[in-house]
Amino acid sequence: MARPVRVVVLGAGSWGTTVAGLAAHNTPTLLWARNSDTADEINNEHRNSRYLGDRPLPDSMRSTADLVEAAHEADVLVVGVPSHAVRSTLAQIANEVRAWVPVLSLAKGLEPGTRLRPTEVIAECLPGHPVGLLAGPNIAREIVDGLAAASVVATQDVRVATALQPLFASAVFRVYRNTDVLGCELGGVLKNIVAIASGMADGLDVGDNTRAMVLARGLAEMTRLGEAMGANPRTFAGLTGVGDLIATCMSPSSRNRRVGEYIARGMTVDEAVAKLGQVAEGVKTAPTVMELARDYNVEMPIAAEVEAVVAGRQTPEGAYRGLRKVAAGGEHEVA
């Protein structure tokens, strides 16, 4: 009888822990935690109190603080560290991961300086490995609580995606597949910026009509940039596009939405991130996205205002006044 596929997840934040829990219901799973106390808590108490409170984790899920041990065990490697830490983490195990092991990214940001997407960073660090991502409208705590959700495994080789789907699926967690890695990954990156704008709308109490406008026009910006970069525009109408956008902009648990709300209520960006206590990818990503928008000659007025707020050149109130001044042409035109 063939040995079960062993899944290793790097990063014991809320989403990394949740994905490890999903996999642990289907196959042997090991979660690498940077902090040994976190690993001990998962192994002994079957919970990750810092990120998921008292929610129980599968008894079968194991954790380690030894990165090399984790790399040696992987038949499938899932990279759940923040986008700015992907390269430094993988550099430590570049010679430890067996050949041809598929690698999935969970990160939803861009590498500072290089502007590379996480899958591109992974491909540089682990050449020759099939690379993809797992993404969708996934609020970690809801999934751990057993509420229904769906996600997408995106790899260029549909055979790899098909093989990976059942490792994470359950009766209440549907996993679809897609070969548009670029589009799926950009959806996860760009929606964080729109979520900050949505959070600012909440903090300013501008009303549901304005929030709906921000979501709809934000999706248009996401799609325009994605198509200009070579993604399939239809991808942005799916789970990794509009689906992830809605969840991130509407959920009280959304980190990027909360950062936007905190800023609109008078906090500085640093104070908002400190209160959050977790990574809000949109804060780090906004300047890089605007560089891409300029490179590809794509108008992104919402993203531009968010970037200005994050950089301290604009106030949330000024950002919304600026958006009201954007000329309205045909709905499917630029602005």
Curated annotation (Swiss-Prot):
Top-rank EC class of the record's enzyme: oxidoreductase
EC assignment: 1.1.1.94
GO biological process: carbohydrate metabolic process; glycerol-3-phosphate biosynthetic process; glycerol-3-phosphate catabolic process; glycerophospholipid metabolic process; phospholipid biosynthetic process
A molecular-function term among this protein's GO annotations: glycerol-3-phosphate dehydrogenase [NAD(P)+] activity
Coiled-coil region list: none
Residues annotated as catalytic: 191
Matches recorded under InterPro entries: 6-PGluconate_DH-like_C_sf, 6PGD_dom2, G3P_DH_NAD-dep, G3P_DH_NAD-dep_C, G3P_DH_NAD-dep_N, NAD(P)-bd_dom_sf
Pfam families reported in the protein's UniProt record: NAD_Gly3P_dh_C, NAD_Gly3P_dh_N
Binding site for sn-glycerol 3-phosphate: 108, 136, 191, 244, 254-256
Superkingdom field: Bacteria
Pathway membership: Membrane lipid metabolism; glycerophospholipid metabolism
Positions with a binding annotation for NADPH: 14-15, 34, 108, 140, 255, 279, 281
Compartment(s) where it occurs, according to its Swiss-Prot or TrEMBL record: Cytoplasm
Primary subcellular site in the record, as a coarse category: cytoplasm
Protein purpose: Catalyzes the reduction of the glycolytic intermediate dihydroxyacetone phosphate (DHAP) to sn-glycerol 3-phosphate (G3P), the key precursor for phospholipid synthesis.
UniProt family annotation: Belongs to the NAD-dependent glycerol-3-phosphate dehydrogenase family.
Name assigned to this protein: Glycerol-3-phosphate dehydrogenase [NAD(P)+] 1
